[in-house]
């Protein structure tokens, strides 16, 4: 009987990774998923490990035995730079330090299209994590663009749902790099292929959609598809910077963190589009159709 390949997944309870794991043949793969909280998680064939990426003692034995590691755990929004580097960079380094030198597993790292020196603390922390990953024998780095189609109202998904009913919409002015949004199902397919179908190793995949939008172009497209008037209010960079400073001082969450300004205005990579099965305009059209039918 062929031994199952052992797979260790961080950030396993995220919507993205749950969809990846749903595609895996658990007759062939023995999967352990690391999660901050395993409440209400019930996926057949998956061993859930409650723990923290920063505490390697909690998951050491599973990493040592692994043939494949998918690292998706990350912090994306924080008021302090230290949080980004503790989780995204140092957490990745601690995970890698657990790997057996004899086993040499495939390491698939879910990074970000904004990874870079000019992309604020988040972007730099992801870039430093990538550098750690690329020291390994077998690795794939995946840099997703803006992902839509999930159930959480955040990022571009929040922008879509805020704008789809029309009204006044705030729009950052002067952002040069366009968004190239990609549907969650297409993102899932690429991650699955990288980990379980053994695509070319030791490569960085910039994962983006085929159509680019500035923030203003996105709002105008939503207006056209929805048929609802949108009043666009341009917000200059200096004002966003001020909001970032204020957000750091306030004790409550205002939905904006200091490093988002640098992240927003940084130059981002773009490559030939991945296979796209759901275009953004069609996706928005379906939302509008459901609203009208409801």
Model-derived features: positions:
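Conserved beta-loop-beta element that borders a ligand/cofactor-binding pocket
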Residues: 130-151
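N-terminal Rossmann NAD(P)H-binding glycine-rich loop of SDR-like oxidoreductase domains
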Residues: 2-27
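Mid/C-terminal beta-alpha module of Rossmann-like enzyme folds, strongest
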Residues: 190-253, 275-294
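Glycine-rich "substrate-gating" loop/helix at the edge of Rossmann-like oxidoreductase active sites
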Residues: 145-152, 173-184, 208-211
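NAD(P)H-binding glycine-rich loop region in Rossmannoid oxidoreductase-like domains
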Residues: 40-42, 46-93, 98-101, 113-117
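SDR active-site strand-loop-helix element
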Residues: 10, 34, 69-73, 107-113, ...
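A conserved pocket-lining segment of Rossmann-fold NAD(P)-dependent short-chain dehydrogenase/reductase
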Residues: 161-182, 190, 194, 206
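Short alpha-helix in the Rossmann-fold core of NAD(P)-dependent oxidoreductases
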Residues: 85-92, 108, 126, 180
